[in-house]
Design a protein with these regions (language model features):
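Phosphate-binding glycine-rich/basic clefts of nucleotide- and phosphate-handling proteins
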Residues: 52-62, 186-297
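Residue-level signature of catalytic and energy-coupling elements of molecular machines
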Residues: 31, 100, 135, 208, ...
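Small-residue (GG/TT-enriched) beta-loop-alpha framework at ligand/catalytic clefts
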Residues: 137-218
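Glycine-rich phosphate-binding loop and adjoining helix at the ATP-binding site
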Residues: 106-159
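Helical "lid/coupling" subdomains associated with nucleotide-phosphate turnover
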Residues: 87-93, 97, 146, 153, ...
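Conserved phosphate-binding loops in N-terminal lobes of ATP-dependent enzymes
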Residues: 15-22, 26-127, 274-286
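Gly/Thr-rich phosphate-binding beta-strand-loop-beta motif of the actin/hexokinase/Hsp70
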Residues: 9-43, 162-191, 238
């Protein structure tokens, strides 16, 4: 039942401190919780959004493991239950509910809490309703449960230490594992939301796996999880270095191989596709619908969040390519941890709502 990052037992005295403000981002690949400990210091829990069940050898009862433990110990039957950040049917909603209840129980998140969770900006009312049921049925959030767009939550840490983003007119890009999202905000109002599943981190991972087979002339086949690990560990737009790994071969023996192109070539194509979608689809639509907002927002920093934004140098490279495509200077800003930003921003909103 493992969660990586800060898996802490931060006993929060709700009687003395009031409801615990909690930010939540349930993602298709990873889930993040963000909340203060009893000293007010931020605590982060980041874990894979997956679970597996097994039968207890002694009692025969069903047991649940989630996150990294489930992925490592039960790769043959681990289940990822979200698509585009949402549980799309009743079965996946039940799985997501089990996962989230186990997570908050193990992190000792109290019922006396104020919960704000980030939601994708896609048109899927049934999925959003299912996600709401997952959060509301978890046993936390007695004080309040609210949702806000993920791109708004993620932009909050990018713009400062408070909630300055809510008072701004700006553009937000979310480079996610299952979607590329873009939208404009005018003082917190969502405008021209755009989402596509054609340009994603997951698809890039699949391309990396395919290119490794091609680069090694068919001698090496890796799964998507391994490809994602290579991307997260080695990808770098500033200073990529070729790396070597070893795999065990069927029948015994080991094979050492070196990767020179298979990580960065797919990422190079990914960025080109992001620029094309943002410049020629999202921004074209925004200019057509809200010309003044388009003009104002392009003259201000564009917030970039999502797991793909964690790759070193990718934000600067995206800034250069987008500016070249638009034939104007653009300024992209990202929080220190783009993958945690949505949960952090959601937590700040929860804190403000409990103060009001």
């Amino acid at each position: 039942m493992a969660a990586d990052s800060s898996e802490t037992d931060a006993s929060f005295d709700t009687a003395a401190d009031g409801p615990l403000p909690v930010g939540v981002k349930l993602g298709s690949t990873r889930t993040v919780l963000y909340y203060p400990d009893e000293d007010g210091d931020p605590q982060t829990v980041r874990t894979l959004t997956c679970l597996a069940t097994y039968e207890d050898a002694l009692s025969g009862s069903e047991r649940v493991v989630y996150g990294e433990q489930a992925a490592e110990e039960y790769p043959d039957r681990v289940q990822y239950m979200l698509r585009s950040g949402l549980p799309e049917d009743d079965d996946r909603a039940d799985l997501a509910g089990t996962f989230f209840r186990e997570l908050v129980k193990n992190q000792k998140i109290p019922a006396d809490s104020a919960v704000v969770y980030a939601i994708p900006t896609i048109d899927n009312e049934a999925g959003l309703d299912n996600l709401a049921e997952v959060i509301e049925g978890s046993g936390i959030g007695d004080e309040l449960v609210r949702s806000f767009p993920e791109s708004l939550c993620g932009a909050i840490p990018a713009f400062g230490d408070d909630l300055e983003a809510i008072d701004e007119i700006f553009l937000a890009l979310n480079l996610g594992s299952t979607n590329l999202e873009a939208c404009a905000y005018r003082h917190g109002e969502l405008m021209s939301p755009f989402s596509t599943g054609a340009v994603t981190g997951n698809e890039t991972d699949r391309q990396i796996a395919n290119m490794i087979e091609e680069e090694t002339q068919g001698r090496v086949n890796v799964d998507v999880e391994t490809a994602r690990g290579y991307k997260e560990e080695h990808a770098d737009f500033d200073d990529f270095e070729a790396f070597t790994d070893v795999i065990q071969q069927p029948g015994g023996g080991a094979h050492e191989f070196t990767i020179e192109r298979s990580v960065m070539d797919p990422l190079d194509g990914y960025l080109d596709d992001v620029v094309d979608e943002v410049a020629n689809n999202f921004l074209a639509e925004l200019a057509n619908d809200h010309m003044k907002v388009y003009q104002l927002a392009l003259g201000r920093p564009i917030a970039v969040t999502g797991g793909m934004a964690c790759i070193p140098g990718i934000v600067d490279e995206l800034e250069d390519r987008l500016g070249e495509e638009l034939q104007r200077d653009v300024d992209l800003v990202a929080p220190d941890r783009p993958d945690l930003a949505a949960a952090e921003g959601a937590q700040r909103i929860a804190e403000r709502l409990t103060d009001d």
